Regions:
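A glycine- and small-residue-enriched flexible loop/hinge signal that marks low-structured segments
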Residues: 2-3, 7-17, 23, 28-36, ...
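Intrinsically disordered, low-complexity acidic/polar segments
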Residues: 93-94, 176, 402-405
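Short, flexible loop/turn elements at secondary-structure junctions
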Residues: 168-173, 378, 397-399
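Acidic, low-complexity glycine/serine/threonine-rich segments
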Residues: 317-379
Length: 411
């Protein structure tokens, strides 16, 4: 039989390429807010809603509660994806809730005795809940997630498909809410920005900060003054909302390795409480707040957040240390999805090692890491472990610290 010949060049595409590791989207914001007069179709209660152009929906965010100001603050800083969970306003009698109290079993005289308004425009009566209960949420009687816990299911929602990485409840962030947000942040590998609730002076904020030690948190104080187009007045806007928007903008423009500090905040007029700051003075309000891991606000060529730290004082002391760990862990782990359940062969393990090393090298080259390495240790991978389908790969890295303290020696 004659042999078939070919005179030329052929290309055979291989599907066995090393996995490319891309950064997770670190700029997705998650906000919990109130707004009884918001568009109920766009902002249903206790359900995550994805906004891709925040500025386009400000007219549907209402004027009551915290939703409009939170979205306006974000939109003034950046155009990014925002996931909103609207919760009932505890101060409103008509705040909807899943646990409606029914009085249908009472006769008219009893209903009158209890002061139940049966007029057509009367609001239904609901079990009493505090605002913290609404914001924190949990699960209802049907197993549905409510309040901030609804952020946990955003990524698995077909209409959303994104995980919030920057989360806050601006204007609603009491101590209980902030601590609960940190629990959610740990589950999502997200970062929380929160105000110092009810603190009027630097000393109040410093005392408040002593109650926290979470690495997923940055406390900010005071708040901003900004113009509210809906009321026509200059009003207090939560600084945490601006922190979320600015954080997303920095991620877009510079990267998650750059801290929130010393970047101009757009479209603000002032701050809610005075803060003394001097670049060269250790004895200032700003430095005292920073020394207690509170990010404050200064005015120099515009208003700027001033501070880099989390309440965690051991390993993850800087905001960027926590966020670097989060982004790196998720980027590397999520890229292995297609590898899971593939044959555990030396070739596949080498491909994983190659992909991780390439990613780490790229991050070092781009200045997002100081250094990094990845390796396979035979001590971790005994024959017994490998036969059980388990492989262990190690990597380590050095995050990029912010240049926080510069000493200049003049002679």
């Amino acid at each position: 039989m004659s042999e078939t010949r070919f005179h030329g060049a052929r290309v055979r595409e291989s599907t066995g390429l090393a996995t490319a590791i891309n950064d997770v989207d670190s700029s997705v914001i998650g906000i919990v807010a109130t707004a009884d007069d918001a568009d109920e179709t766009l902002f249903p209660l206790n359900k995550p809603t994805l906004l891709t152009r925040v500025s386009d929906v400000l007219g549907k965010a209402g004027t009551k509660g915290t939703l409009y100001k939170s979205l306006k603050a974000v939109a003034d800083q950046v155009s990014t994806k925002v996931i909103v969970v609207r919760v009932p306003d505890a101060s409103s009698q008509g705040a909807p809730d899943t646990g409606v109290t029914s009085f249908g079993h009472l006769d008219p005289e009893d209903r009158a005795f209890f002061g139940i308004d049966e007029s057509e425009d009367a609001h239904p009566v609901y079990p009493h809940k505090t605002q913290d209960q609404y914001v924190i949420g949990g699960t209802d009687g049907d197993g549905n997630y409510t309040g901030m816990y609804a952020l946990l299911i955003a990524e698995q929602d077909d209409a959303i498909g994104y995980r919030p990485r920057i989360i806050a409840a601006p204007g609603l962030d009491t101590e209980a809410v902030t601590k609960s947000l940190c629990v959610i942040a740990e589950k999502l590998r997200a970062f929380v920005y929160a105000g110092c609730h009810n603190c009027k002076k630097p000393a109040d904020a410093i005392s408040y900060r002593a109650r926290f030690n979470e690495r997923e948190l940055m406390l900010v104080w005071p708040d901003f003054i900004a113009h509210n187009p809906k009321s026509g007045a200059n009003e207090v806007f939560p600084a945490a909302a601006y922190a979320c928007g600015l954080r997303a903008r920095i991620d877009h423009e510079q990267g998650w390795h750059k801290s929130l500090s010393n970047v101009p905040v757009r479209n603000v007029l002032g701050i809610s409480s005075p803060v003394f700051w001097s670049l060269q003075s250790e004895d200032s309000d700003a430095n005292n707040l920073n020394n207690k891991e509170i990010t404050t606000i200064i005015c120099r060529n515009g208003f700027r957040f001033w501070g880099n730290r989390t309440p965690e004082t051991k390993a993850y002391i800087f905001e960027v240390y926590t966020r670097t760990a989060q982004v790196l862990a998720d980027s590397i782990a999520e890229a292995q999805f297609e590898t899971i359940d593939a044959p555990l062969t030396p070739a596949n393990v080498k491909d994983v090692l190659s992909a991780i090393r390439a990613k780490l090298d790229a991050l070092v080259t781009s200045g997002r890491l100081v250094g990094a390495e990845c390796w396979y240790d035979v001590v971790d991978n005994s024959t017994t472990e490998l036969r059980q389908g388990r492989v262990r790969i190690r990597y380590k890295y050095t995050p990029v610290p912010p240049l926080e303290d510069m000493e200049l020696y003049q002679t």
